[in-house]
A protein has these predicted regions:
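Intrinsically disordered, low-complexity boundary segments flanking structured domains
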Residues: 18-19, 89-93, 140-141, 252-253
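N-terminal signal-anchor transmembrane helix
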Residues: 58-124
Length: 356
């Protein structure tokens, strides 16, 4: 019986690993980008269960070798998001509030009705900026309670699970609500004035995921992320990109986004900070992200308590310290990376225009 279970697990791991490598955008292929940790655990379980089989003839030995290779491949992709890896963003030791900015991001789940729970978490975390997605008019009416402490707001409530509400206690300038790729998917850009006077270019996104009932392929999501990455790469102001990206940190698209945008990820060397699925611990991965310029250092990063949604909120506090740019290494792009990003954006916009 152990051998049968080991064989079934091995086949599942190998199929999932191979499909995740395939350069195709179909949702049923791209979905295998997500469960890297789960596939690694299943690979280890299969190796342990079949320990007395792997040297009994070449078919079993070959399967064992492939399983070890799959385990190594999965671990290679996720190890950067463990405390074993070097930190991409240094810890800030500055105590200057004038340089700091804190953000709470929450996918509220549009059908969730525990608004009081979310408001309590937001008040306890006390961020400078609250970004909520999947917000409709019902959520707008409840979350407007934040306006008493966060009077600078951008409201784009929608009934299609892609609404976006932004509340800030810091002044917002040059605010834009755009539909970057698809006509029904908004994003928000604004310049945030820090207490010390510096301006930060904030980009809030929530692209459509590749999933049944959403999109048959990952092109709309990939194009939006890479378009934002291209926009911010040469920005004169420091940049923060945040939101529910509907992608994991280790996917090819997110890694390409990081290289094209030249932004850093504070989770590297610290942990996964998995936010989805809040109610299913065995199937949980990081979908809610914050990327920023290398001129920021990290003050705090934590996952916040459950708010009734299928996502946990996440909180990040950053300190703008320009000398950090010389000490923190942002990812760099190649000409091939830029070409791939350019082609993806062009394809995504063409598809969005044809369907809009």
């Amino acid at each position: 019986m152990r051998s049968i279970i080991a064989l079934v697990l091995a086949v599942l791991v190998l199929v999932g690993t191979v499909l995740s490598i395939v350069r195709a955008r179909a949702w049923w292929i791209r979905i295998w980008d997500f469960p890297r940790v789960q596939l690694a655990v299943l690979a280890a379980a299969a190796l342990a269960l079949g320990w007395d089989r792997w040297l009994r003839g070449w078919p079993w030995t070959a399967l064992g070798v492939l399983l070890v290779a799959a385990l190594a491949f999965q671990l290679m992709l996720v190890w950067r998001y463990t405390p074993l890896a070097p930190r991409e963003v240094q810890r800030s030791r500055a105590a200057d509030d004038g340089r700091r900015i804190s953000i709470m991001i929450s996918n509220v789940l549009q059908t969730n009705r525990q608004a009081d729970r979310l408001l309590a978490v937001a008040r306890a975390a006390d961020p400078d900026i609250v970004l909520c997605v999947e917000t409709d008019d019902w959520w707008r009416a409840r979350l407007d309670a934040l306006a008493t402490t966060h009077p600078h707001a951008v409201r784009c409530a929608l009934p299609n699970t892609y609404g976006m509400l932004l509340y800030s206690r810091l002044p917002l300038e040059d605010v834009r609500e755009e539909r970057l790729v698809e006509p029904d998917i908004p994003s928000v850009q604004a310049r945030v004035r820090l207490r010390g006077g510096a301006r930060v270019w904030l980009n809030c996104v929530h692209p459509r995921p590749p999933a049944p009932g959403e999109s048959d392929e990952s092109l709309p999501r990939d194009a939006e992320l890479l378009l934002v990455g291209k926009r911010v790469r040469d920005a004169s102001d420091p940049v923060i990109v945040c939101g529910d990206l509907n992608d994991v940190a280790w996917s090819r698209t997110t890694r390409l986004f990081q290289k094209v945008s030249r932004l850093v990820d504070p989770r590297k060397g610290r942990g996964l900070y998995s936010t989805f699925h809040a109610r299913v611990p065995l199937f949980r991965w990081p979908l809610d992200h914050v990327f920023h310029s290398d001129s920021f250092r990290l003050v705090a990063l934590r996952r916040l308590p459950y708010v009734g949604s299928d996502h946990f909120p996440v909180f990040v506090a950053l300190s703008h310290e320009p000398p950090a740019a010389a000490e923190q290494e942002a990812p760099t792009e190649t000409s091939e990376d830029l070409q791939e990003a350019r082609e993806t954006v062009q394809e995504g916009r063409a598809q969005g225009a044809s369907t809009g």
